[in-house]
């Protein structure tokens, strides 16, 4: 009897390991297919279906196979046993079965209407990820890469517009979607499709907050390939990066909104408490991420880690990851922390790294971002069939489609009108139309929706979110190139040539009476540049003027301690260096790169310019169109473009 029991236990353990291997193998094959498809698309210059859309297609096919080609394997999984002596759910439970004690761990709470779907298919159950995997493993590399690869010159030049779209625009989208969905919910109650009280207004606002998270990864990838006008790219990229962080904190704030009396009534105290939570969590997460980046910058500045690039890269990665984990452990939002950690690391720490570490960190996070994004989009396709508690309601889905388009319009057009009143460099109508078109939903909305699927309203939200992501990625992502052509938006813009048309921030700071900036945030940019140039850069990096020349005399000992020896022989370049440089720039030792003690002495002088590279025919079709000012025209041959 004992031998049989041990045999059954070993068999169950082996079966569990087998299912885990099958799960990893499925995702491995999906990623292999996705990579081969990406190569095929790039080789044939096919832009009407992005790699994320292809990953979703493969996920759908695999989910369809798993759903209908696998048989039920676990009959006992849906059986409910009563434990009358337990008044709460313990984290671990020891159960004595025929004189053998087994340990079980708490997994999640299951509603009464979700018990029946648990009868049966263990493979489908295994293929349903723990939602925390998305937030703790897959999303941090994506968000960090967004901050680390930020082109800060254009970002700061459009800072006011980006903040307006990200904060005020997200709030507008949340409220508009919530109001429209509340109207449709009332119609569903009137039609008998919902019971009165199943869906509260706070649930509609919760859905509005998660659907306000835009993720135009498909559009931005095509923009990058075609070298679209940098202002449009920066506005859309900056909005999407900050919008993700705002939407996550906003979703959490709405979820903890709890009026004392009626959950469907407005409570001023609970409302202001939620607003306070939003501001406190966002500010705390920002401070946490920035603090870890400052610590990393100081460590890389005052140690000789640059002599050991492997150790330097490892420390950089672990401290960046610690920003996320520390924020989560402190009850803050790790996604916001890791975003601003990436931005600050790019601005300061990157300048202290050796050339090897610069290349390694850039490639490491670019690779992690690529894998994480494709795993999420593959899983989206899988989840349509492997998730066993879908609730599809035609009226709710119709309302959601209408709501996201109306909310996007209420976000972009009124805010652009207000911003243009104060901007010298206006946001043209074709930019506004493109931003309206680019309001795709993606990884963030999906991750927020799947985090809680226990109640029927949350299951309906999750199922609807999946359909919205599929539609926007396939339709809007695939229509990006034709839309650029129709709106006559510049492509092939050389960033360096575009920047020559605008005065640098340093020149603006020295010639305030002579010239007026073309950017709406110039005064803020000048103030920040001056403070950063005189104090922060010299403290945290090897560049900038010596602190002995900028701090008061009584700070002499501290100034000498914090000033790098390289600062006495180096002057900060007139134009602030870009955060991330590409391989060609690293190869020629980019002229605006800050001093690093481990960098080779060879560098371009201040008055030297790299020879311009004339793009060949292949590069033109790939999107590297040279000098810019062109309009994209579609040829008769699909997937190709010509220049005007």
Curated annotation (Swiss-Prot):
The entry's keywords: Antiport, Cell membrane, Cytoplasmic vesicle, Endosome, Ion transport, Membrane, Sodium, Sodium transport, Transmembrane, Transmembrane helix, Transport
Lumenal side stretches: 1-20, 67-126, 186-203, 257-277, 386, 451-465
Subcellular location: Late endosome membrane; Early endosome membrane; Recycling endosome membrane; Cell membrane
Subunit structure and binding partners: Homodimer; phosphatidylinositol-4,5-bisphosphate (PIP2) and phosphatidylinositol 3,4,5-trisphosphate (PIP3) could be involved in the dimer stabilization. Interacts (via the C-terminus) with RACK1. Interacts with CHP1.
Protein name: Sodium/hydrogen exchanger 9
Function: Endosomal Na(+), K(+)/H(+) antiporter. Mediates the electroneutral exchange of endosomal luminal H(+) for a cytosolic Na(+) or K(+). By facilitating proton efflux, SLC9A9 counteracts the acidity generated by vacuolar (V)-ATPase, thereby limiting luminal acidification. Regulates organellar pH and consequently, endosome maturation and endocytic trafficking of plasma membrane receptors and neurotransporters. Promotes the recycling of transferrin receptors back to the cell surface to facilitate additional iron uptake in the brain.
Family stated for the protein in its record: Belongs to the monovalent cation:proton antiporter 1 (CPA1) transporter (TC 2.A.36) family.
Disulfide cross-links: none
UniProt xrefs under Pfam families: Na_H_Exchanger
An individual GO BP term: regulation of intracellular pH
Residue ranges, Cytoplasmic side: 42-45, 148-164, 225-235, 299-301, 344-364, 408-429, 487-644
Ranges annotated as spanning the membrane: 21-41, 46-66, 127-147, 165-185, 204-224, 236-256, 278-298, 302-322, 323-343, 365-385, 387-407, 430-450, 466-486
UniProt-listed PANTHER family: SODIUM/HYDROGEN EXCHANGER (PTHR10110), SODIUM_HYDROGEN EXCHANGER 9 (PTHR10110:SF61)
Gene Ontology, cellular component aspect: early endosome membrane; early phagosome; late endosome membrane; phagocytic vesicle membrane; plasma membrane; recycling endosome; recycling endosome membrane
GO molecular function: potassium:proton antiporter activity; protein homodimerization activity; sodium:proton antiporter activity
The reaction(s) this protein catalyses: Na(+)(in) + H(+)(out) = Na(+)(out) + H(+)(in); K(+)(in) + H(+)(out) = K(+)(out) + H(+)(in)
Lineage, top ranks: Eukaryota, Metazoa, Chordata, Craniata, Vertebrata
Protein's membrane topology: Multi-pass membrane protein
Region (Disordered): 593-622
Native source species: Equus caballus
